[in-house]
Amino acid sequence: METLSQDSLLECQICFNYYSPRRRPKLLDCKHTCCSVCLQQMRTSQKDVRCPWCRGITKLPPGFSVSQLPDDPEVLAVIAIPHTSEHTPVFIKLPSNGCYMLPLPISKERTLLPGDMGCRLLPGSQQKSLTVVTIPAEQQPLQGGAPPEAVEEEPDRRGVVKSSTWSGVCTVILVACVLVFLLGIVLHNMSCISKRFTVISCG
């Protein structure tokens, strides 16, 4: 239940959008909280802001904007805490011609945990391990030259590219052979049909 109440603290209970810099959690005089976008929409239709839950009125002086209402400190505290249960989905194209959603583990010290199993969502026996390599900023390819890790992994990449290219070539050759075989059958049948109507000479 704690997760549900914590999740409900993270989103506006009117529009069910998560709080963000654009949708700030604003505290009304009655101590209820909703996002600044919903409050702005309520303000356009009314002079004062009326709480949708208790109908309490929050008076705003003339020229006073909804953005000038105080932010809810409890909600800001919950938003500021990193949640270990949240993962950003990353799509990685694997050599097995599949695209899978992989939740990458997150740590406070390092962005990614190297050597962790990343492919937990693969079906059955198709589990594959994913090793994450953290490259220092000064060695990244955009800033000149390939990093040493990339140079070491280059033969592996070439092998994967060669094997996928070879399997593609084999597939094309196999399909071409099947089509030639079927064409031969069709032509043979057509020649047999045309022989039925020819006049056989006797003699």
Swiss-Prot record:
Gene: Rnf152
GO cellular component, one term: organelle membrane
Pfam families, per database record: RNF152_C, zf-RING_5
GO BP annotations, alphabetical order: apoptotic process; cellular response to amino acid starvation; negative regulation of TORC1 signaling; positive regulation of autophagy; protein K48-linked ubiquitination; protein K63-linked ubiquitination; protein monoubiquitination
Places the protein is found: Lysosome membrane
ZnF RING-type: positions: 12-55
Region (Disordered): 139-158
Family according to the record: Belongs to the RNF152 family.
Pathway noted in the entry: Protein modification; protein ubiquitination
Annotated spans, Necessary for interaction with RRAGA: 106-165
Full protein name: E3 ubiquitin-protein ligase RNF152
EC number: 2.3.2.27
Description of how the protein assembles with itself and partners: Interacts with RRAGA (inactive GDP-bound form); stimulated by amino acid starvation. Interacts with SEC16A.
Disulfide bonds listed in the record: none
Traits of the deletion mutant: Mice lacking Rnf152 do not show overt embryonic development defect.
One annotated GO molecular function: small GTPase binding
Membrane topology annotation: Single-pass membrane protein
Biological role stated in the UniProt entry: E3 ubiquitin-protein ligase that acts as a negative regulator of mTORC1 signaling by mediating ubiquitination of RagA/RRAGA and RHEB. Catalyzes 'Lys-63'-linked polyubiquitination of RagA/RRAGA in response to amino acid starvation, thereby regulating mTORC1 signaling. Also mediates monoubiquitination of RHEB, promoting its association with the TSC-TBC complex and subsequent inhibition. Also mediates 'Lys-48'-linked polyubiquitination of target proteins and their subsequent targeting to the proteasome for degradation. Induces apoptosis when overexpressed.
Biological source species: Mus musculus (Mouse)
Catalytic activity: S-ubiquitinyl-[E2 ubiquitin-conjugating enzyme]-L-cysteine + [acceptor protein]-L-lysine = [E2 ubiquitin-conjugating enzyme]-L-cysteine + N(6)-ubiquitinyl-[acceptor protein]-L-lysine
PTM section of the record: Ubiquitinated. Autoubiquitinated in vitro, leading to its degradation by the proteasome.
UniProt keyword annotations, A-Z: Apoptosis, Lysosome, Membrane, Metal-binding, Transferase, Transmembrane, Transmembrane helix, Ubl conjugation, Ubl conjugation pathway, Zinc, Zinc-finger
Residues that span the membrane, as ranges: 167-187
